[in-house]
């Protein structure tokens, strides 16, 4: 058997608000998906991202409860350069999303910032400081 990682799933309280956030990060999700109870998007490289409303999850797991306080999932989005980290952070916070950590130059050689998605999950934005390429293993 060849098992492989294939999907990142996020439980959401408000599908439309969550999808609007991830669209701003470049995830290709059709506008008509905002009212759906389950949505999936291809990320490339054989990976998918999925969102399920709390109600959808309870439909097959009636005792399910969202984890209190969020922050149980970390996602990281690579930016082309440090200026893009700053710009994306500014765009998201100006749109009303909660900034958790404003952009800073991290000791590990990256420009880094963290914005919380609508359900309280930290979403990292990063880019190399030294001009090194962004790629596998270069995130947090």
Placement of each model-derived feature along the sequence:
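Glyoxalase I/VOC metalloenzyme domain signal
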Residues: 1-6, 11-33, 43-98, 116-140
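A short glycine-rich beta-strand->turn/loop micro-motif centered on a GG-aromatic cluster
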Residues: 34-35, 102
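Active-site/ligand-binding-proximal alpha/beta "capping" segment
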Residues: 98-104
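Short, small/polar residue-rich loop motifs at catalytic or cofactor-binding pockets
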Residues: 107-110
């Amino acid at each position: 058997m060849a098992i492989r990682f294939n999907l990142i799933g996020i439980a959401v309280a408000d599908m439309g608000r969550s999808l609007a956030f991830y669209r701003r990060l470049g995830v290709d999700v059709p506008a008509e998906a905002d009212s759906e109870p389950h949505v999936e998007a291809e990320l490339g490289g054989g990976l998918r991202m999925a969102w399920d409303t709390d109600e959808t999850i309870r439909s097959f797991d009636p005792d399910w409860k969202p984890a209190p306080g969020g922050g149980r999932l970390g996602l990281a989005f690579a930016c082309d350069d440090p200026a893009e980290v700053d710009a994306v952070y500014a765009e998201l916070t100006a749109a009303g999303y909660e900034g958790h950590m404003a952009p800073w130059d991290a000791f590990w050689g990256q420009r880094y910032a963290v914005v919380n998605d609508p359900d309280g999950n930290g979403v990292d934005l990063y880019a190399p400081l030294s001009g090194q390429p962004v790629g596998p293993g270069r995130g947090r």
